[in-house]
């Protein structure tokens, strides 16, 4: 029996099943309106809420964490500063030279975080931050050896900004306690501890006491500040100066930030709010932590695959449900779960009689990465040959042409939902801040980073289409400039340190 005959299934039944699944992933204009309105409501509640954490309380709203960043750079800043960046998979240490003309020079050491720190629950916070301290010393030894040779009064201290891309309760520009891990980390004893203090202690142990961690930020705020610095006073297409309004990340995770009027941030202590306003500081950058939007699922749709991924495979069940529908970490996992289900229903991969016979990689959570989906998304080759090769290489999984057509339809629906949901917080912020109507033309800039929005084929186009369908409409979408903020977390952390 030939391979194709062995795999032959009821094509009509498979097609019907895929149509049903794709339909469950659709986000139409009405749903965009509904979600955007609720997002604004959750922003308002979050700005007024003084409790800490991300408990699933309907009235709590979004975290809306004050960052204590009260001004934005304009490209004229100068100086040499250090930055450290702990992301979802890598740790970077950077030396950033701000040239004062919207440009910068950077030296960096990037290290892949060892698997044991990501997946082992027995790892302690001391072990993790000791690793960060050792990698920082390796960077200094390579790029700033003069710091290690200096002694006593000859030591010239260097400011460092620390980009920590996880939810923290930030009480000042230079301190913040971890609320909870997201993405891959599971080190429970870090929760509730000041991450700046943990890092500074390990730097001191490594003989790097000349480095002062003076600013705590996250990748999203860093991206926003970096974008503001490099864009300077860029004229818009209408001849006006376009205004930076939002910083956002669409990569392993997703999040956003924006400048909010201090008088609206009721969660700040009254005396602090009064003092800032007296000092002439009228706005503060708010870290939204929008990955946790609608954890109660009051308005977000949930397929059975979303529920399974959250409850069975994610490191933080019940939290960051919005992120689990958008971010690159979960796109491939959603497809993997759908394929396993279609096999269980006897609609695909008929050569494997039961679940146990399926290739190990197809049964392994998070084995199917978004890079594979990106190749499938744009595959227009004869017989979908690129899709066939991608599955053979990534999962050791042979497929028929009918199966590949079904897989491509699923991939396109998964990523379209991701891009459409990504438009919700952007539209909500623009409406809440009235940014599109502040001036005659009202053109705005959105600084972004993350491999999904930067590299995934068609993601930005789908995002723009969703924005046009959202409450801001076609006219609002046309006023938006999407700008890539490369190396945002490193440069942004340095900019935070500069003003500390």
From Swiss-Prot:
GO cellular component terms listed in the entry, alphabetical order: cytoplasm; cytosol; mitochondrion
Residue positions, PTM Phosphoserine: 2, 470
Keywords associated with the record: Acetylation, ATP-binding, Cytoplasm, Glycolysis, Kinase, Nucleotide-binding, Phosphoprotein, Sporulation, Transferase
UniProt-annotated binding residues for ATP: 110, 487-492
Segments passing through the bilayer: none
Region called Hexokinase large subdomain, residue ranges: 218-487
Phosphoprotein keyword on record: yes
Glucose-binding: annotated span: 159-185
UniProt modified residues of type N-acetylserine: 2
Record's miscellaneous remark: Present with 10600 molecules/cell in log phase SD medium.
Name of the protein this chain belongs to: Putative glucokinase-2
Native species: Saccharomyces cerevisiae (strain ATCC 204508 / S288c)
Lineage: Eukaryota, Fungi, Dikarya, Ascomycota, Saccharomycotina
Gene symbol of the encoding locus: EMI2
């Amino acid at each position: 029996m030939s391979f194709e005959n062995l795999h032959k299934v009821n094509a009509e039944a498979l097609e019907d099943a895929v149509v049903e699944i794709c339909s469950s992933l659709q986000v139409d204009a009405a749903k965009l309106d509904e979600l955007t309105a609720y997002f604004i409501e959750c922003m308002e509640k979050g700005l007024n809420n003084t409790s800490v954490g991300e408990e699933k309380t309907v009235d709590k709203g979004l975290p809306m964490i004050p960052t204590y960043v009260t001004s934005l750079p304009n490209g004229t800043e100068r100086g040499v500063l250090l930055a450290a960046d702990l992301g979802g998979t890598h740790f970077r240490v950077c030396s950033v030279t701000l040239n004062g003309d919207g440009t910068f020079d950077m030296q960096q050491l990037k290290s892949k975080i060892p698997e044991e720190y990501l997946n082992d629950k027995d790892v302690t916070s001391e072990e993790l931050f000791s690793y960060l301290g050792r990698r920082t010393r390796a960077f200094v030894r390579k790029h700033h050896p003069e710091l290690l040779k200096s002694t006593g009064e000859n030591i010239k201290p260097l400011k460092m900004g620390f980009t920590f891309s996880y939810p923290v309760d930030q009480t000042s520009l230079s301190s913040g306690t971890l609320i909870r891990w997201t993405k891959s980390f599971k080190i429970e004893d870090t929760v509730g501890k000041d991450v700046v203090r943990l890092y500074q202690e390990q730097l001191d142990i490594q003989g790097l006491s000349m480095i002062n961690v003076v600013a705590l930020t996250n990748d999203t705020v860093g991206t926003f500040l970096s974008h503001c610095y490099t864009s300077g006073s860029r004229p818009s297409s209408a001849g006006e100066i376009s205004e930076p309004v939002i910083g956002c990340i669409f990569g392993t995770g997703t999040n956003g930030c924006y400048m909010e009027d201090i008088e609206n941030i009721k969660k700040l202590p009254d005396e602090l709010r009064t003092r800032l306003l007296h000092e002439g500081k009228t706005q503060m950058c708010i870290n939204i932590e929008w990955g946790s939007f609608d954890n109660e699922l009051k308005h977000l749709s949930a397929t059975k695959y979303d529920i399974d991924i959250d409850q069975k495979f994610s490191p933080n069940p019940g939290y960051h449900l919005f992120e689990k529908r958008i971010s690159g970490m979960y796109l491939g996992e959603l497809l993997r779960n759908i394929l396993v289900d279609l096999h269980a229903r006897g609609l695909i991969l008929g050569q494997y009689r039961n679940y146990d016979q399926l290739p190990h990689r197809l049964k392994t959570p998070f084995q199917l990465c978004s890079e594979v989906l990106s190749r499938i998304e744009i595959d227009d080759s004869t017989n979908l040959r690129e899709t066939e090769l991608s599955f053979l290489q990534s999962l050791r999984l042979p497929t028929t042409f009918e199966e590949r057509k079904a897989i491509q339809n699923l991939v396109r629906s998964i990523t379209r939902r991701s891009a459409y949901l990504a438009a919700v917080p952007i539209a909500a912020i623009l409406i809440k801040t009235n940014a599109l109507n502040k001036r005659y033309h009202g053109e705005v800039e959105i600084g972004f980073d993350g491999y999904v929005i930067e590299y995934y084929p068609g993601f930005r186009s789908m995002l723009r289409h969703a924005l046009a369908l959202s409450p801001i409409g076609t006219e609002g979408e046309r006023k938006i400039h999407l700008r890539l903020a490369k190396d945002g977390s490193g440069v942004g952390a340095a900019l935070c340190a500069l003003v500390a």
